[in-house]
């Protein structure tokens, strides 16, 4: 008999967002049966609106080694590992891979409950593309005009090359003074049209501003990402189904684009396996000319 369920993730905050709708489905099923459920990370409370454990994941010594989802018969507790990297090999970090992971978790729930808890995962991953919980947001400031958001934090996973594109962004800001360039990682610059999310969100007063970054991205014409945590939070359903949105990912392989294998994406999406600032600059200059100014020069 399962008396308690603890979701945990010892690695990435971005996974909290991409897992959110799956975790909610499981939470609803557990709540129907009166099973106590929580997420063993303090960030989960405001990032994905799920109950948070009284202990952080690192206060569970048996979880820090990143074990597979398992059932502890002594405490009747099911521990569910939600880190995609444990289940899926590299080059498969996307919503389709998340679907396969949660199907596997559903099988473990079925076994741990002696066949009593059946959770069906829909084959359409678009149904699980996450949305931002606007009622949980702290105040944000969004610059007026055309906005491009750069999720240029250094990724801690292997899905992308390291680099913050500072040189490329500075050149673009010089070329296009009428466009606002919003960046998640701070770097040296002298342009009035470069903004940093730390200054647009209430970052100093909250645990993390990833949900706010996702919210800001929905007001941007372009999203430029590298599969970092902030980039993951910009992969929202509103962005996916917006035909006026352009999403560019600089990642190692197509499998690391979140839209890979997802039907119904209306945004203009593209990916590139490059990392040097010159290539990033040239690609984005061409994209901006074509999508915002509607010319190819």
Residue spans of the language-model regions?
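Catalytic machinery of carbohydrate-active enzymes
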Residues: 1-297
